[in-house]
Regions:
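E2/UBC-UEV (E2-variant) core
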Residues: 207-224
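Terminal catalytic/cofactor-binding subdomain
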Residues: 1-153, 160-161, 167, 187-202, ...
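Hydrophobic/aromatic-rich, well-ordered segments within soluble, folded domains that form packed cores
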Residues: 150, 162-183
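Short, structured patches in soluble enzyme cores that scaffold and shape functional sites
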Residues: 154, 175-177, 220-222, 260-262
Length: 550
């Protein structure tokens, strides 16, 4: 086959971003905070949000954009949510996402420190505009909801596959794709991929019932999905959300909004999930590459999604078109296409990150096929939990590698005798954002993880390194990555420079529009940027240069 035109190699990198909703847990009540009780505690989060690195001149009525180009806000269900800035690689997105997690950790510590010392909030927030919030905060500190703990997971403790009222919060992925790509093609190619991606992208979740005892699901979000595609997010949840808010020139770009994914604790799992998705989207964007391939969807895709989720043997059979597959074999089908596209036909340039992602994807599927749980445990959350829980129950002779539906009557009886509450506590504490209490963080420091990481790195040397350094997080905390986040950062610099000369009445920041008003009686000056790769626009540059050099 002839190589494609060379201009295929000049395509801009895909814009990738994530939105992570965090869960608030009442230490006093020992339960997740109920959104219905939100009015009792939500006023305190004006103070909670003030701990994030955001422009001070925009307080208190502010949309939550940060110095690093990301955004923090209170979302549906009163979950604090962090959105990364527009990133140009999966690795960058993971680093900026992790910076947001550490911001949440800092905010939790500050909020609970204020509970112990009520003067702290008054000292920290000296702006008179916050008097009312401080008073409300102090008044409610002794209420039943504090101390608050923050978790990075997606399900309440009470949610089971049979629960009629699902309670879940999301981790959402965003990918830029050309608007010329039809949704029907995206659905056809991507839905089977998303159904099986939970093999390595799931964060695991322990469930139980009174017949078979506890069992481990590969992922959390599949338990609450109802549709393959729709415009909803909180009811009748789809894998792909079709409500198109491109935050860009809509005639050129679509923002593909994926809500099936889990909020991983492992940056390696998160990276593989984002990178593999972006690589498969590269195939979708190519007009000719997938021509002639059969992507006929499996029967009952949502049922299949949940069946795979509950199968820790990774062997659930299903048809895609005429071919019989398992989740592993279907992921290999996509991986083979990506390898041919990048490494054989060289239709686009394979950067080092892309080559690493392809190699890791293949090595992970190889290990899953061998059922090498320990090797994957340092890198994938669901395998870490499988390893942890099997270690705890090893004296019983049982294993969570056997799904509940395959257990004998004697095995079911033994599983029912396992102290579920102890296991479930570890399951939940795996997702603590406070690192000194996080089971994930503690597990990463075990000898097993060190040994298996060393073993895996003999095949893939880049796995010997930590995914990110302290310097990476420090940069991602304060500075935007390449792209439009730097344009918003330049606007903040402009507004703060003016504010040092004369107080600014108000500013407003959104993804593609910034608003500036010097005095109350003035009209707004608007700055617009519909290009997520663009770091500066001419109108903002002229304003910024004027104040920089005046």
């Amino acid at each position: 086959m002839a190589k494609p035109p060379s201009d295929r190699k000049d395509i801009k990198p895909r814009i990738i971003g994530t939105e992570t909703e965090y869960a608030l847990f009442s230490g006093m009540q020992n339960m997740f905070l109920d959104p219905k009780a939100a009015p009792t505690y939500i006023s305190n989060f004006h103070i909670f949000l003030e701990t994030f690195p955001r422009p001070s001149l925009a307080r208190p009525n502010y949309t939550g954009f940060l110095y690093n180009g990301g955004r923090v806000y209170i979302d549906t269900g009163f979950h604090p949510e962090y959105a990364t800035p527009e990133c140009q690689s999966a690795r960058t997105a993971v680093i900026y996402e992790r910076a947001g997690q550490y911001m949440m950790e800092q905010a939790e510590e500050f909020l609970n420190a204020c509970m112990r010392n009520q003067d702290l909030a008054r000292e920290y927030l000296s702006d008179p505009a916050f008097d009312a919030y401080r008073d409300a905060f102090a008044e409610k500190l002794n209420k039943k909801y504090f101390p608050v703990r923050i978790f990075r997971n997606n399900m309440t403790l009470e949610t089971l596959p049979t629960t009629p009222d699902y309670v879940s919060w999301g981790f959402h992925e965003n990918y830029s794709i050309p608007s010329r790509i039809e949704l029907a093609k995206i659905e056809k190619v991507m839905i089977p991929f998303f159904i099986t991606r939970q093999l390595y992208g799931g964060s695991g979740w322990l469930i139980t019932n009174n017949k078979t005892g506890p069992s481990l699901c590969l992922a959390q979000r599949p338990l609450v999905m109802q549709l393959t595609m729709s415009s909803g997010t909180t009811s009748n949840r789809p894998l792909i959300n079709t409500r198109d808010e491109p935050h860009a020139a809509g005639d050129l770009l679509r923002r593909l909004h994926i809500i099936i994914g889990d909020a991983n604790m492992s940056p390696w799992a998160q990276w593989l999930k984002l990178a593999a998705t972006s690589l498969v989207l590269d195939l979708v964007e190519d007009e000719m590459f997938l021509e002639g391939l059969d992507f006929s969807p499996p029967n009952n895709p949502i049922t299949l999604l949940r069946d795979i989720c509950k199968d820790t043997t990774f062997s659930t059979p299903f048809f895609m078109g005429p071919k019989l597959h398992t989740a592993v074999s279907l992921q290999r089908f996509y991986l083979d296409l990506v390898q041919r596209y990048y490494l054989v036909e060289e239709r686009r340039e394979a950067t080092q990150e892309i080559r690493n992602a392809i190699a890791f994807w293949q090595a992970v599927l190889d290990a899953i096929e061998r059922s090498d749980i320990a090797l994957l445990a340092p890198f994938l959350d669901n395998f870490a939990k499988l390893c942890l829980f099997d270690t705890i129950i090893q004296e019983t002779g049982l294993s969570f590698k056997k799904p509940a539906h395959d257990r004998s009557s004697s095995e079911r009886k033994k599983f029912l005798e396992i102290p579920f509450d102890r296991l479930k506590s570890l399951d939940l504490m795996y997702h603590r954002v406070l690192r000194r209490e996080s089971v994930y963080a503690k597990f990463q420091n075990t000898s097993l993880c060190r040994e298996e990481r060393k073993k895996f790195s003999t095949r893939l040397p880049f796995l010997a390194n930590e995914f990110f350094t302290d310097a990476d997080i420090e940069t991602a905390w304060w500075y935007p990555p390449e792209g439009r986040g730097r344009w918003r950062g330049a606007f903040i610099e402009f507004a703060e420079t003016i504010n040092r000369i004369e107080p600014v009445f108000s500013i407003g920041i959104d993804w593609s529009i910034c608003r500036f008003r010097q005095r109350e009686q003035d009209s707004d000056t608007l700055f617009k940027n519909d290009d997520p790769w663009c770091e500066m626009t001419a109108d903002l540059k002229s304003k910024l240069d004027a104040v920089r050099y005046s």
